[in-house]
Amino acid sequence: MINRFSIEKVKGLEIIDSRGNPTIRVFVRTNDGVESFGDAPAGASKGTREAIEVRDENGLTVKRAVDIANYIIDPALHGIDVREQGIIDKILIDIDSTENKSKLGGNTIIATSIAALKTASKALGLEVFKYIAGPRLPKIPIPLLNIINGGLHAGNKLKIQEFIILPIKFNTFKEAFFAAIEVYRNLKGLISERYGKIYTAVGDEGGFSPPLEETREALDLIYTSINNAGYQGKIYMGMDAAASDFYDPKKEKYIIDGKELNPTQLLEFYLDLAKEYPIVYLEDPFEENSFDMFGELQNKLNSTIVTGDDLYTTNIKYLKIGIEKRSTKGVIVKPNQVGTISETFEFTNLARRNSIKLVTSHRSGETEDNFIAEFAVGIESDFIKTGAPARGERTSKYNKLLEIENKFGLEYGGKYFYL
């Protein structure tokens, strides 16, 4: 008897992401004709420990990744029960046999892994988030909206990569999200008034990139926008420093705001900012090997969620170091950093067992697929980072969260969040 859940076909397709760069979409189909897909996102600012993408012609195509899906992965997964996520991912890991997924490509592997999960949920007639959550009733995560861009995400002189708002003190996700949109619109007006309408064009993640030079200029703009919109004490602030990108390893200094700072001076810089602004979230404040400095900052900023992205790259090996050193209260969750859904589950489960907040994140190169929104709800992520409330590949995720809240009546995580 044929198992209707058995994988009948795996097929790769070259598509483009939100930056116009090629990426891979993988389709997984069962014997019963049920099919879904997974897209591989791509980051601009990457940790050195991330899974390696397979690309060709200086990154201009992913033809080899498509061939790998069609001629290596397809026969390897033929006949496997699509509900067996762990088995599927282990087969992919074993065939690849490298620590950084460089043989099959992290992009090929994660697209296949996502496609299998989505196909399994579809075959069972379940929403993706319900399939992941099981019997648990999850909450809608708090959004972290990146509304001013700097660093590798912008063409200005700001070194901090993302300036973020967090709408926390609201009863529903819808209330929180639309309040954040008011702040975003207010910010757009301020930028247009002060710097000209040309600077209200948006960057890769939907945020603005005004001609700013120093960190406090960006923070002042956002703080003013929050107050003008009437949400002081309800909407808070955060930053993703992506500090590895402005760290000079030869000098062992951080080049920021026209100064060269040693790690201790940079720590004091962050402490001063936390006194001046309602900053409750700080991601990658030091370069990616500075577990001790992360921990020192977290210890001194107890009410701020210091979070590791490049520090951990969704890899359990590095999370264990961070747990031992008490480096952070938060972790970024990016499935494509490690390469499979199963490894991502291992990472999030370990973080949860150690009372570490989960921050599920998009990448700067995204597609219109809203998988990451469902994934964030399913794992009961505390937060979700998926850009500003602009650009279709960002708003598709927010619209999915609005739909889930409306259809299933899930509670908003911010309602119960205490700083």
From Swiss-Prot:
GO biological process: glycolytic process
Active site residues according to the UniProt entry: E205 (proton donor), K334 (proton acceptor)
Pathway: Carbohydrate degradation; glycolysis; pyruvate from D-glyceraldehyde 3-phosphate: step 4/5
Needed cofactors: Mg(2+)
Entry note: cofactor: Binds a second Mg(2+) ion via substrate during catalysis.
SMART domains: Enolase_C, Enolase_N
Reactions catalysed according to its record: (2R)-2-phosphoglycerate = phosphoenolpyruvate + H2O
Compartmental location: Cytoplasm; Secreted; Cell surface
Residue sites binding (2R)-2-phosphoglycerate per the record: Q161, K334, R363, S364, K385
Record-listed Mg(2+) binding positions: D240, E283, D309
Coiled coil: none
A GO molecular function held by the record: magnesium ion binding
Main location as per UniProt: cytoplasm
Function, in words: Catalyzes the reversible conversion of 2-phosphoglycerate (2-PG) into phosphoenolpyruvate (PEP). It is essential for the degradation of carbohydrates via glycolysis.
HAMAP family in alphabetical order: Enolase
Designated name of the protein: Enolase
Organism per entry: Saccharolobus islandicus (strain L.S.2.15 / Lassen #1) (Sulfolobus islandicus)
